[in-house]
């Protein structure tokens, strides 16, 4: 067991809660102690929903362990069914309740409820949230469709079926959930995009789907796997049992959206889409070819998040914006293989870890100019003084905007372009201010044109301001006890001319060179010599 202050994923029963909360007419009875009810806050505070998740907790206490906890489970099952009258009932247990081994799913199956009852067994000590969501969605679809044998679905999934029936092709969008990254907006964007290409959306699941909608899944011509972490297992099962093909391209970015449309048109035997549609619909291709984008070319970027968004971000950064990807990783071990493959194409070794300290150390070692990650990478990047944009869950409430802000499709590419480029542009402004801070116009004590109304800092305020803007002088005092070389005012002035997002790396390299060369004081010449040494 490992103690930590941060985790990228919750236990698997939180993933089951995401599926139940995303759907309509589904209720989840969770065998759990009172302390495990914290997950409600994820939906009301982070997702900002106006209602609590449809979950009933058994909330057993220590004194209940001396009695029959199975009867406690049965009582809560009856109460939940009588009160909520769900169309389908999910039954599971939290990580703590798993130790009691009451098997609430088996208990519920034998109580004779007149609705589908799906028992969810999630290994809490070996799997995590995304796997729990995937397994819950898979078991729910399988449990509901098991009442409808595949030969009775009455649908042929040959590409020519929709043509012979004289209708438009229809697809299922599988994978979006609550607490996913911009899932609701992604669905709206894809529904609009597919409609423009003559393709109807048949069922969206699990988000806002009902159990009856899951019964209609086989009536579509193919499935679109939007989020492999959640929907790939279900898509594979539908392919095996109903012969339903599914798309494997996630349409995040201009190039991926183009490939996604080509894949759908090919699977459905439709005419090929317009290859120039991306340039017409999205501003990202135009900007990446403009003169202004030269500032972005070759920028070093570090990427970490869930597998789907990390892989998509790496492709956009490398192929569409001209960035240099210096780090790529994920916390999702289920997506380790495709992330490793994507990293190998970029000449990198993927970072597969759920230890935020290891991620921060890798980030500092890579010395990027932009970080694309989760909420935790935003905190780590702030400590390192690096611009950051959030591209993946886990996220904070500020990453759940009330406005329309998709990640998929042509409009999603525009949103991504804004989210990634703006931190770099603001970083450029900060660097320019730092470069010209000591010029005549920026001197703090310079008299205002308003005469006596102009501000005048006291000597103490000036010292505090200098300490805040130039923390390196204070760090020299602290590090002198470690026999580090001392920075002269000339050396500090030269260091201040270097962009802030690589200044830390330059400082470390210069001090390392000074130790090797036996220099006790670092001046401007030492900075130049270190630069030549490490470039050689």
Swiss-Prot record:
Residues 448-469 have a biased composition (Low complexity). Its EC number is 1.3.7.7. Transmembrane segments: none annotated. Disulfide bonds: none annotated. It catalyses: chlorophyllide a + oxidized 2[4Fe-4S]-[ferredoxin] + 2 ADP + 2 phosphate = protochlorophyllide a + reduced 2[4Fe-4S]-[ferredoxin] + 2 ATP + 2 H2O. Binds 1 [4Fe-4S] cluster per heterodimer. The cluster is bound at the heterodimer interface by residues from both subunits. Its cofactor is [4Fe-4S] cluster. GO terms for biological process: light-independent chlorophyll biosynthetic process; photosynthesis, dark reaction. Keywords: 4Fe-4S, ATP-binding, Chlorophyll biosynthesis, Iron, Iron-sulfur, Metal-binding, Nucleotide-binding, Oxidoreductase, Photosynthesis. The keyword ATP-binding applies. Pathway: Porphyrin-containing compound metabolism; chlorophyll biosynthesis (light-independent). It holds the Pfam family Oxidored_nitro. [4Fe-4S] cluster binds at residue 36. Substrate binds at residues 427-428. Residues 470-483 have a biased composition (Polar residues). InterPro entries: ChlB/BchB/BchZ (IPR050152), LI-POR_suB-like_C (IPR013580), Nase/OxRdtase_comp1 (IPR000510), P-CP_red_C (IPR042298), Protochl_reductB (IPR005969), Protochlorophyllide_Rdtase (IPR016209). The active site is at residue 292. One of its GO terms (molecular function) is 4 iron, 4 sulfur cluster binding. Residues 447-489 are annotated as: Disordered. Protochlorophyllide reductase is composed of three subunits; ChlL, ChlN and ChlB. Forms a heterotetramer of two ChlB and two ChlN subunits. Component of the dark-operative protochlorophyllide reductase (DPOR) that uses Mg-ATP and reduced ferredoxin to reduce ring D of protochlorophyllide (Pchlide) to form chlorophyllide a (Chlide). This reaction is light-independent. The NB-protein (ChlN-ChlB) is the catalytic component of the complex. Belongs to the ChlB/BchB/BchZ family. This is Light-independent protochlorophyllide reductase subunit B. It comes from Prochlorococcus marinus (strain MIT 9303). The lineage of its organism: Bacteria, Bacillati, Cyanobacteriota, Cyanophyceae, Synechococcales.
């Amino acid at each position: 067991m490992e103690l930590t202050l941060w985790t990228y994923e919750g236990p698997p029963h939180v993933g089951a809660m995401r599926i139940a909360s995303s759907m309509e007419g589904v209720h989840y009875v969770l065998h759990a102690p009172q302390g495990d009810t914290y997950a409600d806050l994820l939906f009301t505070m982070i997702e900002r929903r106006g209602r609590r998740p449809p979950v009933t907790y058994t909330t057993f206490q220590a004194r209940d362990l001396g009695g029959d906890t199975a009867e406690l489970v049965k009582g809560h099952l009856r109460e939940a069914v009588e009160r909520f009258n769900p169309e389908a009932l999910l039954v599971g247990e939290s990580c703590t309740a798993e130790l009691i081994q009451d098997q609430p799913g088996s208990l519920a199956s034998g109580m004779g409820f007149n609705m589908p009852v799906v028992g969810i067994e999630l290994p809490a000590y070996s799997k995590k949230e995304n796997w729990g969501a995937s397994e819950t969605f898979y078991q729910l679809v399988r449990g509901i469709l098991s009442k409808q044998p595949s030969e009775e679905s009455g649908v042929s999934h040959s590409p020519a079926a929709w043509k012979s029936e004289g209708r438009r092709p229809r697809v299922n969008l599988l994978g979006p959930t609550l607490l996913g990254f911009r899932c609701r907006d992604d669905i709206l964007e894809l529904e609009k995009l597919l409609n423009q290409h003559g393709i109807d959306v048949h069922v969206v699941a699990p988000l806002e789907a009902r159990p009856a909608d899951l019964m209609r899944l086989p009536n579509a011509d193919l499935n679109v796997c939007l989020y492999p972490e959640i929907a790939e297992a279900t898509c594979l099962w539908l392919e095996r049992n109903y012969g339903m093909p599914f798309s494997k391209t996630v349409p995040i970015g201009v190039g991926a959206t183009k490939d996604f449309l080509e894949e759908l048109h090919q699977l459905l035997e439709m005419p090929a889409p317009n290859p120039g549609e991306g340039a017409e619909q999205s501003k990202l291709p135009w900007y990446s070819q403009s003169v202004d984008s030269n500032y972005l070319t070759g920028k070093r970027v570090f990427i970490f998040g869930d597998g789907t968004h990390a892989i998509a971000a790496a492709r956009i950064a490398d192929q569409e914006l001209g960035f240099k990807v210096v780090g790529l990783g994920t916390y999702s071990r289920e997506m380790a293989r495709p992330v490793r493959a994507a990293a190998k194409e970029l000449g990198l070794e993927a970072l597969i870890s759920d230890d935020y300290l290891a991620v921060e150390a890798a980030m500092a070692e890579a010395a990027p100019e932009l970080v694309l990650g989760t909420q935790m990478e935003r905190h780590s990047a702030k400590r390192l003084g690096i611009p950051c944009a959030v591209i993946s869950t886990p996220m904070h409430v500020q990453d759940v905007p009330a406005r329309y802000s998709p990640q998929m499709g042509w409009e999603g590419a525009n949103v991504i372009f804004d989210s990634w480029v703006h931190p770099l542009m603001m970083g450029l402004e900060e660097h320019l201010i730092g470069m010209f801070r000591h010029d005549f116009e920026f001197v703090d004590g310079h008299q205002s044109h308003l005469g006596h109304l102009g501000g005048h800092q006291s000597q103490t305020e000036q010292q505090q301001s200098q300490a805040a803007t130039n923390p390196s002088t204070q760090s020299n005092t602290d590090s002198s006890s470690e026999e580090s070389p001392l920075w002269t005012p000339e050396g500090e002035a030269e260091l201040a001319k270097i962009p802030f997002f690589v200044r830390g790396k330059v400082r470390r390299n210069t001090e390392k060179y000074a130790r090797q060369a036996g220099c006790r004081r670092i001046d401007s010449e030492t900075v130049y010599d270190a630069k030549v040494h490490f470039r050689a």
